[in-house]
Swiss-Prot record:
The keyword Magnesium applies. It holds the Pfam family Terpene_synth. CDD domains: Terpene_cyclase_plant_C1. InterPro entries: Isoprenoid_synthase_dom_sf, Terpene_cyclase-like_1_C, Terpene_cyclase_plant_C1, Terpene_synth_N, Terpene_synth_N_sf, Terpene_synthase-like, Terpene_synthase_metal-bd, Terpenoid_cyclase/PrenylTrfase. PANTHER family: (-)-GERMACRENE D SYNTHASE-LIKE ISOFORM X2, OS04G0344100 PROTEIN-RELATED. Transmembrane segments: none annotated. GO terms for biological process: diterpenoid biosynthetic process. This is Probable sesquiterpene synthase. Sesquiterpene synthase. Keywords: Lyase, Magnesium, Manganese, Metal-binding. Mg(2+) 2 binds at D315, D319. Its cofactor is Mg(2+); Mn(2+). It comes from Santalum murrayanum (Bitter quandong).
Length: 562
C-alpha cells in the first residue's frame, strides 16, 4: 500500500508543511467492541458450591496418584491426563514427586516397568520425564529399531504408539538424530493412516499433526482434550469433572480480569487517539493467558497486559504512522524517561508517552510495596532497548536500505519483543523473580535468543507480504533472498530449519539442572508457544480471523458443559 497523506493537524509541531506522507497500514479495527467490558458475577452460592466440589475432587485425585506409586505406567497416564486437561497446576508437588520417583526407579536404577516393550508406554515415559526436565536418553527407543536402524515394520499398525512417539519427538535436543528420524517416520505414517482410524484416535492424530502438544497452549489444548478424553470409555470421571469445573471457575476469574482491563483501556481512548494503530486488547489478553493462566499470576497478568497494549501502540507509531523526525523525538524522550519530555513531542504522541509513564509508575508503586523496586530498572531498560530497535528499523525503511540477514537479525531479535515481554512477565511473579534471575535474563542466554528467533522468524514468514505491500522495512525473508540469491520458497525452507534448531535450543535449556527457577523458564517456553499458535498459518494478531476468534471464544466466552 502506498504512503498516504494525512492532515497536518495531527502533528501541530510541523506547521511549515501542508501535508505529510505517512506509511498508513489500514489495520482492521477491533472485532470485539465493548463485549468484554461488562462482567456479571456468578451467583455466590453457586460459586461456593463449585469451589467445594473442586476441593473434594482434588483430594480424590491425590489419593489416586498416591495409590499408583508402585504402578508407574498407571501413574504416567494419570499425570498425562492432568496435564492435557489443564489441571496439572493443582498437583504440582504431587506430579514432581511422582516423576522424580519414576525417574529414579526406572531410569537411574535401570529397572523395567510394566509396558516397557510397548511403544506407547515408552514414548509417554520419555516425553513426560523430558518435559519435567529429566535428561533421559532417547536410546530407550533402540528396541523399536531393526539392525539397520530403521523403525520396525510391526510398528506400522500401532497408531496409538506412533502418535505418542510423534509427540515425544518434539522434546528432542541437538544430536538426537534418532528422534529426527522418528519425527519423519511417524508423521509420514500417521498422515497415511489417519483417514482409516476411528474416533477419537483419528481426531487426536489430526490435531497433533496440526498442533503438536509440546508447542500448544496448555489451556487451549485442554479445551480440545475435554471431548477426546470423555470419548474414552475408561476415562477417569473424577478427573474430567474436576477439569471442567476448574476450567469454568478460572474462565470467570479471567473474564473479570479482562473486564477490569477493558474499562481501563477504554478510559485511555487509544482507539480514537491512535486510529492508525492495532486495537488488540482482547487478543493481547489471550496472548497473556498463554503465558500464564493460573490464578496465582493474576497480578503478573495485569502488569503485562497494560505494558503489552503500550508496546503494541508504540510499535505501530514507528511502523505505521510516525515520520523519521517525529520518531527521533520519541526515541529521545524514551531514553530520558521524564514527564518533562512531553513538551518536545508532536501532539499525537503525547497521550502514548504519558500513558507509558503512568503505567510504569503504577507498576513501580506495586514493586515498592513488595520490596522489589530493583525490578523497575530492568523493565525500563528493555523498553528503551526495544524502542531503539524500532528506530533502527524506521531508519532502514526511510532509506530503503536492505541490510544483510545477519545485520537484520541483530535488530529484529530485539524488536521481536520477546526479551521485552519475558522481562515484563517476571515483574509480578513474586520472590522467585530475583535480581539474579533478571541478570541471567539480561545476559541473553540461549533460551532467550531461541525464543526471539521463533518469534521473529514466524512473524516474518506470515506477515512479510502484507508488510511489503504497504512500504514496510525489509523483512528477514527479503534480506535473506537478497543476500543469498534464493527464491522466497527457499528462504522459507531455511527459516523452517532455523525454527527446528531454535526449538531444540529451548528444549535443551529446559533440562535440569535449571539455571533459574523452573516457573521462569516456563514463561519463556509459553511465550514461544503463543507465537507458534497465533502465527501458525497467518498473523492472527494483526488480522483476526476464524482461528483466532475461535481460540478467544474457547477461553473467554464459552464455558464447558460439566
Amino acid at each position: 500500500m502506498e504512503n498516504q497523506k494525512m492532515p497536518i493537524s495531527s502533528v501541530p509541531n510541523l506547521k511549515d508543511l501542508n501535508m505529510i506522507s505517512r506509511p498508513i497500514a489500514n489495520f482492521p479495527p477491533s472485532i470485539w467492541g465493548d463485549r468484554f467490558i461488562n462482567y456479571t458475577c456468578e451467583d455466590e452460592n453457586d460459586q461456593t458450591q463449585k469451589e467445594r466440589q473442586v476441593e473434594e475432587l482434588k483430594e480424590q485425585v491425590r489419593r489416586e496418584l498416591a495409590a499408583t506409586v508402585d504402578k508407574p505406567l498407571q501413574q504416567l497416564n494419570i499425570i498425562d491426563a492432568t496435564q492435557r486437561l489443564g489441571i496439572a497446576y493443582l498437583f504440582e508437588n504431587e506430579i514432581e514427586e511422582s516423576l522424580k520417583h519414576i525417574y529414579l526407579h526406572t531410569y537411574v536404577e535401570n529397572n523395567c516397568f510394566e509396558g516397557s516393550d510397548d511403544l506407547y508406554s515408552v514414548a509417554l515415559w520419555f516425553r513426560l520425564l523430558r518435559q519435567n526436565g529429566y535428561k533421559v536418553s532417547c536410546d530407550v527407543f533402540n528396541k523399536f529399531r531393526d539392525n539397520e536402524g530403521n523403525f520396525k515394520n510391526n510398528l506400522m499398525e500401532d497408531a496409538k504408539g506412533l502418535l505418542e512417539l510423534y509427540e515425544a519427538t518434539h522434546v528432542s535436543i541437538h544430536g538426537e538424530e534418532m528422534l529426527d528420524d522418528a519425527l519423519e517416520f511417524t508423521k509420514t505414517r500417521l498422515e497415511s493412516v489417519v483417514s482409516h482410524l476411528n474416533y477419537p484416535l483419528a481426531e487426536q492424530v489430526r490435531h497433533a499433526l496440526y498442533q503438536p502438544l509440546h508447542r500448544g497452549l496448555p489451556r487451549l489444548e485442554a479445551v480440545y482434550f475435554f471431548r477426546i478424553y470423555e470419548a474414552h470409555a475408561s476415562h477417569n470421571k473424577a478427573l474430567l469433572k474436576l477439569a471442567k469445573l476448574d476450567f469454568n471457575l478460572l474462565q470467570s476469574f479471567h473474564k473479570k480480569e479482562l473486564s477490569d482491563i477493558a474499562r481501563w483501556w477504554k478510559s485511555l481512548d487509544f482507539a480514537a487517539k491512535f486510529p492508525f494503530a492495532r486495537d488488540r486488547l482482547v487478543e493481547g489478553y489471550f496472548w497473556v493467558l498463554g503465558v500464564y493462566f493460573e490464578p496465582q499470576y493474576s497480578l503478573a497478568r495485569k502488569i503485562i497486559i497494560k505494558v503489552f497494549t503500550m508496546i503494541s501502540t508504540i510499535d505501530d507509531i514507528y511502523d505505521a504512522y510516525g515520520t523519521l523526525d517525529e520518531l527521533k523525538l520519541f526515541t529521545k524522550a524514551m531514553q530520558r524517561w521524564d514527564v518533562g519530555s512531553l513538551d518536545q513531542l508532536p501532539e499525537y504522541m503525547k497521550p502514548c508517552y504519558k500513558s507509558i509513564l503512568d503505567v510504569y509508575n503504577e507498576i513501580e508503586e506495586e514493586m515498592a510495596n513488595q520490596g522489589s523496586l530493583f525490578r523497575m530498572h530492568y523493565a525500563k531498560e528493555v523498553m528503551k532497548t526495544i524502542v531503539e530497535g524500532y528506530m533502527d528499523e524506521a531508519k532502514w525503511c526511510h532509506e530503503k536500505y536492505v541490510p544483510t540477514f545477519q545485520e537484520y537479525m541483530s535488530v529484529a531479535l530485539v524488536t521481536s519483543g520477546y526479551t521485552f515481554l519475558t522481562t515484563i512477565s517476571y515483574l509480578g511473579m513474586g520472590e522467585i523473580a530475583s535480581k539474579e534471575a533478571f541478570d541471567w535474563l539480561f545476559s541473553h542466554p540461549p533460551v532467550i535468543e531461541a525464543s526471539e528467533s521463533v518469534g521473529r522468524l514466524m512473524d516474518d514468514m506470515r506477515s512479510h507480504k502484507f508488510e511489503q505491500e504497504r512500504g514496510h522495512v525489509a523483512s528477514g525473508i527479503e534480506c535473506y533472498m537478497k543476500q543469498y540469491g534464493v527464491t522466497e520458497e527457499e528462504a522459507h525452507d531455511e527459516f523452517r530449519k532455523r525454527l527446528v534448531k531454535a526449538w531444540k535450543d529451548i528444549n535443551e535449556e529446559c533440562l535440569r539442572p535449571y539455571r533459574v527457577p523452573k516457573p521462569l523458564l516456563t514463561r519463556i517456553l509459553n511465550l514461544t508457544r503463543v507465537i507458534d499458535v497465533i502465527y501458525k498459518n497467518e498473523d492472527g494478531y494483526t488480522h483476526v480471523k476464524k482461528a483466532m476468534k475461535d481460540n478467544i471464544a474457547s477461553l473467554l466466552i464459552d464455558p464447558v458443559i460439566v
